[in-house]
Amino acid sequence: LASKLASENIKDKPVISGCIGPFSLAGRLYDMSEIMVAIYIEPDAMLQLLTKCTEFLIKYVRALKDTGASGVIIAEPASGLLGKDNDFTVILHNCGNSGQCTDAMIKSGARALHFGNAISMADTLKECPSDILVMGNLDPVRVFKQGTAISVKEETLKLLEITANHPNFVISSGCDIPPHTPEENIRTFIETVEIYNNSPQTPTGGF
C-alpha cells in the first residue's frame, strides 16, 4: 500500500521500494546461527529453502512493480556472514561486506549495487564496471543519527569529493536510516547533495 500511494503521488522523482534478500529471509525463518551450520551439513535442504525464499521474493518484487515503483532495493545483510567461497547468486546490498562479497555482487547481474559503510567506496568503485550504478555508503548511525548538521554536511561532501570522478556513483546512506534520526540531519544531507550537484565544479554525470 505504501509503495502504491507513493507511486501515485510522487511524479517528479523515482519511487524505490525495498525488500529483504533470500538468504537474509531464510536466516530469519530458520534461525541465523542454525543456517550458518546447515549450509555445510545440509546443503540440499538449504538450497531448497533458498529456492522457496527466492520464488516468494520474485512474486513480491513483481507485486511492488505493479504498484508503479521505479525499482526495488534488495537488502541482503546476512550475506556478510558468508565467505567468498559460499556460492549464492543473489547479493545486492550487504551491510557487513568488507570486500569479500564485492565480486559476487558484481556477478549477480544487478543493475545497481548498494554498499554499507564497512567498505572503502573509493576502492570498491575501482572494482565495479562503469555501466553499473554503485550506491552508498554514509554510516547511518554515526553520520545520520549521532551526527550534527555540520558533521553530516562535512561527511557528505567528503564522500562526494572522493567519488567525483565516477559518474556511476549515487551517494546514499549505507543502510536503513535508524528510527529517531534527527530530521535536520536528513534535510542537511539532501540539501548538501543538491547544492553540490548544481555547482559548476561538479563533474559531468555526477549524482
Regions found by a protein language model. Name each.
Residues L1-F207:
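Active-site loop segments of alpha/beta catalytic cores
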